[in-house]
Amino acid sequence: MRSDQIKKGLKQAPARAMLRAVGVGDEDFGRPFVGVVNTFTDGMPCNFHLRELAQHLKAGLKEAGLFPFEFGAPAISDGISMGTPGMRASLVSREVIADSVELIAQGYLYDGMVGLSACDKTIPGTAMGVIRSGVPGMILYGGTIAPGEWQGRKLTIVEVFEAVGQRAAGKISEEELLEIERRAIPGPGACGGQYTANTMAMALEALGLSPVGYNAIPAVHPEKERATKEAGKILAWAIAHDWKPKDFLTRKSFLNAIAAVAATGGSTNAVLHLLALAKEAGVELSLDDFDQISRKTPVIADLRPWGTYTAWELYEAGGTALVFKRLLEAGLLFGEEKTLTGRTLAEEVERAYREQEGQKVVFPVEKALKPHGGLVVLKGNLAPKGAVLKLAGTERTYFEGPARVFDSEEAAMEKVLKGEIRPGDVVVIRYVGPKGAPGMPEMLSVTSAIVGEGLGPEVALLTDGRFSGGTRGLMIGHIAPEAFVGGPIALLEEGDRIRIDVEGRRLEVLLPEEELERRRARWRPRPPAFTHGLFARYAALVRQADEGAVLEDPL
């Protein structure tokens, strides 16, 4: 065992003495040692319950003959930091989490790793770290929150964001906004639609890095405790057979994950995160793969933010296994791909498959809700390296209008709340990319305000930043190259005519190349937002969105 380097032999007596102090007994030195990264925090609901869940996980690992050691990693709430300078920390935390997992795995020479995650960046962050650690491992998702309720309709956090715009437009009262705020989040768990956390949780099941069916179990559902304990047996098998993530994560595994995201109208953040995970696994993946898979994968799940149902209701209907079953039946998944259990994806789906009688959440492919998946990649003179749109949130496929240019989200939000954005406008928010912000913050506050004011179908938004999984409307993000490095979005001026052609996959400013060249000659780079510390280092090393906003390796 790898951990024998720490716990066996004459010279390791001091190490054993220290391990005995934390509960390791004589018989435990013969067990595989496992690191459990727990992204618990009592600062947000997504990860609030992970302290208790970790106890069930560790009990299951011990029952399976392993010895677990728990450690922490940071967790940033997008819902709390949204629309504030704190949002810069969100994507940065993904890299910090991955580095933390790698650091502990290497420092303690553990034989296996488990990531216990819940909110948006803790899922890809722990997954990146577990893959990078080079030992058997898996990711367990804390689960979705239960929906809130107000006036007979189910609520998620997105309804609160949109209520801000409704209040600004005078469509609801201050008292109604307060009631929505009070009722939307009834307890622990991640945001309750097919937003980023639930999207990535499903994607990891399709990849084979999480047990099929586990991640769909809601945070406070009674089944979560039993399933968490059972997961220990899976890791014990993987360690016994030296079955590591890089042994089963293939290009086809990643195409399976993309298909799952496309079929459920999932978050555009999955593009960034799957690109980053593929890099860790040594798998070739590009933006074009997302577009190609999405073109042939219909939307078969009626899920929020664009649809009707919450993630809790998806679990009741049959969960991720039901989605995968439908896709396998249509030949849209590579069922022969192996998973962390050693069995194929198709075998795992058969073991986990169930369907609630009369459910209306997941449809057969022949009765799909939309003929094509939710992810669209646009290119053109505004996005030479690509931009990403979630089509499942809008029915418009062509838009042309004048640019309303803002160099920060705050400036755009001010105009939206004052009612100064008009139907037909194309709102441009730039200098908020991976290097420029830095950290590529999400724009949910401003997009939700636009939707809340009733402008969703009539206004488009472009940004070199990101969007929350809860975003809906004609919102195009991940524009690369970003403004900070001189990408064409930096050359836009107020009133420039923008054309968005979804069917043609084009994003363009209607200006002659000569004019763009004149503007490029006048353009000057901006000073960095940070000159020392973590954010300065991140900005110096981070790559563009089309490469997953991963950090540069030195070699």
From Swiss-Prot:
Cofactor-binding details, from the entry: Binds 1 [2Fe-2S] cluster per subunit. This cluster acts as a Lewis acid cofactor.
Stored Gene3D superfamilies: IlvD/EDD C-terminal domain-like
Keywords (A to Z) from UniProt: 2Fe-2S, Amino-acid biosynthesis, Branched-chain amino acid biosynthesis, Iron, Iron-sulfur, Lyase, Magnesium, Metal-binding
Signal peptide: none
Biological or metabolic pathway of the protein: Amino-acid biosynthesis; L-isoleucine biosynthesis; L-isoleucine from 2-oxobutanoate: step 3/4; Amino-acid biosynthesis; L-valine biosynthesis; L-valine from pyruvate: step 3/4
Reaction it catalyzes: (2R)-2,3-dihydroxy-3-methylbutanoate = 3-methyl-2-oxobutanoate + H2O; (2R,3R)-2,3-dihydroxy-3-methylpentanoate = (S)-3-methyl-2-oxopentanoate + H2O
Functional note: Functions in the biosynthesis of branched-chain amino acids. Catalyzes the dehydration of (2R,3R)-2,3-dihydroxy-3-methylpentanoate (2,3-dihydroxy-3-methylvalerate) into 2-oxo-3-methylpentanoate (2-oxo-3-methylvalerate) and of (2R)-2,3-dihydroxy-3-methylbutanoate (2,3-dihydroxyisovalerate) into 2-oxo-3-methylbutanoate (2-oxoisovalerate), the penultimate precursor to L-isoleucine and L-valine, respectively.
Name the record gives this protein: Dihydroxy-acid dehydratase
Organism from which the protein derives: Thermus thermophilus (strain ATCC 27634 / DSM 579 / HB8)
Taxonomic placement: Bacteria, Thermotogati, Deinococcota, Deinococci, Thermales
Gene that this polypeptide is encoded by: ilvD
